[in-house]
Amino acid sequence: MTLFSSISSISNPMTSSKSSIASFGSGTSMSSNSIACGGGCGGGSGGILGLGLGLGLNLFGGSGSRGACGGNGRSGNPAQGGNGGSCCGGPCCGI
């Protein structure tokens, strides 16, 4: 399930410390925010945080870097029914 290890070359100065770019490459939980969430939990303020790619649920994190779970305080991501950031605590991804 090796995904986007090459994406680690993307260095976004706005990424949150929670969002570990290096954690990409597997679908397992490598930080407090499971990569299964698409990486969106840690980078609510990240600009082009492509880490939302995680499982391909949200290929374009957009300016809000929603990731697969609505990102950090963002809302309305169809992939998770708009849980709006609850993923950061685990519930939306079932962590």
From Swiss-Prot:
GO biological process per UniProt: sorocarp development
Region of interest (Disordered), residue spans: 1-31
Disulfide bond annotation, renumbered to this chain: none
Cited InterPro entries: HssA/B-like_chaperone, HssA/B-related
Superkingdom of source: Eukaryota
Family statement drawn from the similarity comment of this UniProt entry: Belongs to the hssA/B family.
Annotated protein name in UniProt: HssA/B-like protein 45
Gene name, Swiss-Prot/TrEMBL: hssl45
